[in-house]
Amino acid sequence: MSEDDNARRQPTLAARLRAGEKLVSAWSGLPDPLVAEMLARLGFDAVTLDMQHGFHSTESVLRGIAGVALAGKPAIVRIPVGRFDMASRALDMGASAVIAPMINDVEDARAFAAAMKFPPLGERSWGPHRAVQLSRHEDVSTFMRTADRETLSFAMIETRKAFDRLNDILDVDGIDGVFVGPADFSIAWSEGAQVDPGLKEMMPAIEAIAAAAEKNGKLAAIFAADPGRAGRYRQMGYRLVATASDTESLVLGAATLLERAKAG
């Protein structure tokens, strides 16, 4: 059985998260599809391609999703701020989930959801030809019927404004979950005094976000700049933790090898 055939038989990312599995995604900022594919071939459950602060473009996302799929894993795409058109394009390219940054109110959430879901739930237009090729479905009718359920929309919660409107955002039809960005959240929580993804004062709020998602029947995801925090986030109720950026992995790996070479 090929990796592609095996991937088609595996539960979707959405199904695994909704079943309560705790998953870990790698984080890809480098636009070379081979890097994303190599990360996917490790033990990560998914690979996130970052267009906001990473260096991914439309072309590299197209190729990166294919590389991740070739390794039998689902791809997640973080779009730039306000680029909801790119959310639809990422889905057309075969993304299993899209993360939208700076969703601060219901209007933002509705616009994002509209781009992510087909009518009548949303306004996504038809054109997922590449996604159909990469999917487990053999015909477009089945794909159409299942797409809204099998692809996930994560609204990023990064500001006090978003936190204050959290339940309203979670209540929007077509928003499947929230994704916390602890770095930006720490800036907001400290009123611009510091950037500290591990800021102790904001941890009760971070935990409250996961609890609110659970209460509303939605998913909670978060970025862990320090992989050592992943376990704590899982205990809070976060089902998806993204970590291990490719740039940091490259630097740490090279530094370790250099140290060993000099020691020998």
Regions found by a protein language model. Name each.
Residues D85, A97-D173, D184-I187:
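Conserved anion-binding
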Residues M1-S25, G29, H137-R149, I206-I209, ...:
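N-terminal amphipathic alpha-helix/helix-capping segment at the start of soluble metabolic enzymes
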Residues K22-S28, V47-L49, A75-I79, V98-A100, ...:
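Hydrophobic faces of well-ordered beta-strands that scaffold small-molecule active sites
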Residues S28-L42, V81-R89, R160-V172, A225-A230:
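Short, acidic/polar
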Residues A26, L39, D50, V98, ...:
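Conserved, mostly hydrophobic/aromatic
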Residues S57-D92, M116-L121, T146-D148, G198-A220:
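Alpha-helix-loop-beta-strand connector modules within alpha/beta enzyme cores
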Residues V35-R63, P182-G198:
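Glycine-rich, proline-tolerant flexible connector loops at the mouths of alpha/beta enzymes
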Residues G64, V106-G122, T247-G264:
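C-terminal helical cap(s) of enzyme catalytic domains, especially alpha/beta-barrels
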